[in-house]
Amino acid sequence: MRVIDLTQTITENMPVYPGTEGPKLEPASTYEKDGLRETLLTMYSHTGTHMDAPAHIYDGRPTLDAMEADSFAGKGLIIDCREFGEGEEIPLCKIHAAGDLAEEADFLLFLTGWSRLWGKPEYFGNYPVLSQEACQFLIDTGKKGVGLDVISLDPIADAQLTRHHQVLAHDMVIVENLTGLEEAYEASRGGLFTLAVLPMKYENADGAPVRAAAIMEE
């Protein structure tokens, strides 16, 4: 078995969504003073590689803590979208090119290659986004969730969060700021693998950091 980490490390200087504060990692206990080390973490619920709950957008829809654990694991498939440039939409035909695998997967992950810009101002630029027709495919095929190696399912300029509204209305989850999709795509040979994206469980969770992993059977 091979496990590939798809998670960005949380640091104080990491990229965060425009308008939010970065995380704070402060020593709460030290070896010298307390005989152990403990850290006080202060951060927004949508920090780093994280998951959006339906309740992120819709009042009364499920929070992450209310969802069954099997909502966060299943068959994953990576769609290679690296040919799409800045501001381009990823069309439905790109998903159709994966054939039956796209139907069978519980989660579709979209590899744009944008994670190479993590830590640079360009990361917040005009990244490729899914077309609304592609988002509708996720709904029509009953996906558990969608994941991307960019900061949002929507363009940053879309203050209405059109795609978030479209997808989260159907109680899917969205995983943003993934990394390592290139390695996972090569390891999976473009096929299905086991995906685990387990969010922190706290009360009324509208979103949470996750530890995302692609698990390959060798």
Region roles according to the model:
Residues M1-E218:
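Active-/binding-site microenvironments in catalytic and ligand-binding cores
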